């Protein structure tokens, strides 16, 4: 609570204990978090059809070679009969849960005797993120936040005219989040920019990505959400803030009735610690076997082998470790 002071300043004071039996109060709440709105994005068939339509509108005599997606790819998207080679993924449903949980709990205890009074408060807040947990990464890749807060106010009547008030309080916050392998875009932006055919997802613990040569390098598949958040590591930050204040009040009624003197002291400290683990996993690109052995064969050839084989994209997986800490008083 507080009162309005001069120039509009609000003076806030924490609760203090009163003489009497101990009073205990407990408050708990559970909430459900969800996005206010989720965009509905085009599937692969709709995307490919409209993208080709743009070209034919600009160039009515366009041939199949002029199109971004050939007839075979469009048909695969339409039938959805080859989801590894020609996927159609709704990345919001694939990467995000519909809801997440938030909980908050508070415990207050107050009471005391004529000479000693106390007020103690403990609180806990937990917020879970919306990212789904990937299997096989070996760590928690979701957004999460835990906060612990505490407050203890003690009033001692050392004598009939001397009162000592001690207050200690603080907040400990623990934040976990994925290491997004993108310096400028958030996970939400990346999801909006990811095409539905850029990857079939994680299969048997392996990150599968669509090679750009699948569409003759006519479309950029690089700015995809999954490769930038799967196996890229995580960041944990701990922040600890503590406040201590002392007040000594001495009544001076022997000089003038109602006169008193106060001595105040305060000590504040804060500490921060951040741990970052950056990783990179192998990315596997699927190909039809005949596409690698004899690129001259067409899909409609009776000798065309549609067994799927994988090539590794980029370098092998690696791990980087970084820790930073800070302290202030």
Set out the residue ranges of the language-model regions.
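Membrane-proximal, glycine/serine-rich, low-complexity loop/turn segments characteristic
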Residues: 1-241, 247-250
